[in-house]
Amino acid sequence: MTRWIAWTAPAALVLSVGSAAHAVQYLTIPEAQRRAFPSATNFMVVQTDRIWRAEAGNRVIGFFIFDRVIGKHLYIDYSIALDPSGRIRQVDILQYRESYGGEIRSPSWLAQFIGKSNASPLQVGNDIRNISGATLSSHHVTEGIKRIMTIADRLK
């Protein structure tokens, strides 16, 4: 009996430890800015490390906003590109740190936000689909985007 405990106790301890999180950076802020506004000639800082105005020559072509929300346990960095009227033209996940739930980066899931404005409901289960296996991440990113859309109304 003691031999069984001597072998199973360490194995149980190792197996009970949660998997380590891993951070994956998919895009940097400058890469995401260029992806969202390929015709931009300049990104003017509106708020340091958070909001930029995208310009093509002297014309404002939109706004680029960086934000961070908590997933289940760790942060998710994402960006939103808005057209001058305040409608979403692109959402990108820049860095995802959880060890599971990476489906949050799915192009079809992110595409649900395109064209939405502050007047849109932006609610998981209403106009935004939930992601099984990334429930908290999908809710928190959606809530973050809704919060940013409220703030962005002041940029127009």
Predicted regions and their residues:
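Bacterial N-terminal signal peptides that target proteins for export
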Residues: M1-T8
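Bacterial N-terminal signal peptides
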Residues: T8-S16
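Flexible, solvent-exposed loop/hinge segments and secondary-structure transition points
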Residues: S19-R129, T135-H139, E143-K156
